């Protein structure tokens, strides 16, 4: 017979899986976007669902990285991103992500993914290049997500 705690844990796990699936759908849609802004907006939607899933599953490094990515993409969409702000966001991700990391090398994968995408999104208007960077990021996130069971 299942205890209340086991039932609660399973409910949280299943809810996190639903949020992860919705996020995955949004990132897939973003890869077909016709403009950089549209791509960024779909990614923000993905990040919101994925951050919630990471928090539910104890993936704090991932949730932090995603939260900063929401800020980054929002500033990009509003055309308010500067090199200084981008540098500050990257430094915050590295420092706080390292502090919150409880998974060793695996915990650094979201940080690496986000920093590489931050640099790519800031330096190229080429959507095809950004799609390739998204694939690289998805591979890093896949390893992280499998570890936290997202």
What is each stretch, according to the model?
Residues 2-150:
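Alpha-helical membrane-protein topology signature
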């Amino acid at each position: 017979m299942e205890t209340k705690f086991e039932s609660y844990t399973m409910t949280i796990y299943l809810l996190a899986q639903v949020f992860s699936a919705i996020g995955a759908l949004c990132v897939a849609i973003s890869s077909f976007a016709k403009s950089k802004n549209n791509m960024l907006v779909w990614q923000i939607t993905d990040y919101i669902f994925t951050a919630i899933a990471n928090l539910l599953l104890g993936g704090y490094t991932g949730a932090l990285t995603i939260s900063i990515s929401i800020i980054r993409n929002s500033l990009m969409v509003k055309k308010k991103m500067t090199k200084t702000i981008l540098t500050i966001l990257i430094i915050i991700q590295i420092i706080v992500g390292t502090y919150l990391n409880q998974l060793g090398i695996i915990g650094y994968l979201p940080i690496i993914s986000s920093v590489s995408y931050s640099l790519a999104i800031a330096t190229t208007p080429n959507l095809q290049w950004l799609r390739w960077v998204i694939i690289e990021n998805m591979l890093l996130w896949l390893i992280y997500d499998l570890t936290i069971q997202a």
